[in-house]
Amino acid sequence: MKPTGRGYLLLDAHPVGCFRSVELMRAEVPVPEKPPARRPTALVIGSSSGYGLASTIAGLVRYGIDGVGIGLERPAGHRSATAGWYRTVATDAIARELGADFSFRNADAFADTTKTETLDLLAERFGGVDYLIYSVAAPRRTDPRSGTTYQSVLKPLGAPHTTRNLEFADDGAAQVREVTVAPATEAEAAATVGVMGGEDWSRWITALAERGLLRSGFRTVALTYIGSPLTSAIYRGGTIGAAKAHLESTARALTERLAAVDGRAFTSVNGALVTQALTAIPGIPLYVSLLRGVLGDRFPSPVAQSLDLWHQLTARRPDVDDSGRIRLDRWELSEPVQAAVAERWRSITPETVTALADTAWFRAQCRALYGFDVPGVDYTVPVATDLPWPES
């Protein structure tokens, strides 16, 4: 199997490469000296990719969680299954090896039927939930109650924004291209909040509360991002930022509601990483490549940041900022790092991009999302692609 596609989007995923990616993530997690006195129950919404996947692996290996993970993935057909399908198969193998009672559901997290069926499973098998991690990146959401489908857009607010984007030619050569993005309409901004804001997260908490499944001390977290001033017009100051602001206000409202069970809701401001969603945001691929160029191997992996997240979630007094947010991005937003990235951003040209930005690393990371360019995999060996979803 060879990678085929256009730009950052590949059409197939390599099963063995995806398995190996999960193995490498697991290897980053330190094994505790002794198992927990009680296995906590966690619900991870968005467990098949990104920080949701990393948090699931870290939780299984380091914190001994049981529970349920939810992802929405496509099985093999004319093409391979999606990468998240294979990553879930690999993560399930880890859970079974560790003796964890952890089920994976292939379902639309936005749907009421998914909530009902998942809560039925949680009630029957565990009787309650200690943690809920909400890590959903979706282009659209259908509200099951109104029937309205919201479509998110990646646009600035108020005025057009011109930035530079990192792209790759068919031969892998890095290119820098200037792009201008038109501002979002009010309707587009509202729709993006409808997809990526806190409404669905809040509905999950409400559903758990109505079923009496919130254990004492329950904690929940949704992942957010602030990012650099270099990307603020398209990210924090754009439609996505409006959705993240709604997510953060939802956390404050949820904390008030969770007082009855001595619970808390947080947003976690994580640092940059390479995801399929990120590659679609103009300017972000170049910024992350420059950030890696500055930091080198000091760039924290998703697993490293997820271990920090679990440490904060399980701490008696989590380290939060003045807005009540867990901050895992201080390494990225430190003044020396941002100054160095900004200097490279100002200096970059098509001729200097490979010297100033770690473009080879970024391209490899993007391909690894689909199971390609993963160390330790022989890509000349034929592979089976039609693998079953893990049994509950």
UniProtKB/Swiss-Prot annotation:
**UniProt-listed InterPro entries:** Eno_Rdtase_FAD-bd_dom, Enoyl-CoA_Rdtase_cat_dom, FabV-like_NADH_b, Trans-2-enoyl-CoA_reductase
Q: What is its EC number?
A: 1.3.1.9
* Active site (catalytic residues): 235 (proton donor)
Residues that bind substrate: 225
Instruction: Give, as in the UniProt entry, the pathway in which the protein acts.
Output: Lipid metabolism; fatty acid biosynthesis
Q: List the disulfide bonds.
A: none
UniProt record, GO biological process:
fatty acid biosynthetic process
Sorted alphabetically, the keyword list is: Fatty acid biosynthesis, Fatty acid metabolism, Lipid biosynthesis, Lipid metabolism, NAD, Oxidoreductase
Q: Does the keyword NAD apply?
A: yes
Catalytic activity annotation:
a 2,3-saturated acyl-[ACP] + NAD(+) = a (2E)-enoyl-[ACP] + NADH + H(+)
Q: Enzyme class, one word?
A: oxidoreductase
Q: GO MF annotations for this entry?
A: enoyl-[acyl-carrier-protein] reductase (NADH) activity; NAD binding; trans-2-enoyl-CoA reductase (NADH) activity
Q: Which residues bind NAD(+)?
A: 46-51, 72-73, 108-109, 136-137, 244, 273-275
Site Plays an important role in discriminating NADH against NADPH: which residues? 73
What protein family does this chain belong to? Answer: Belongs to the TER reductase family.
HAMAP family recorded for this chain?
FabV_reductase
The subunit structure is: Monomer.
Task: Say what the protein does.
Answer: Involved in the final reduction of the elongation cycle of fatty acid synthesis (FAS II). Catalyzes the reduction of a carbon-carbon double bond in an enoyl moiety that is covalently linked to an acyl carrier protein (ACP).
- What name does the UniProt record give this protein? Enoyl-[acyl-carrier-protein] reductase [NADH]
Please give the organism: Streptomyces avermitilis (strain ATCC 31267 / DSM 46492 / JCM 5070 / NBRC 14893 / NCIMB 12804 / NRRL 8165 / MA-4680)
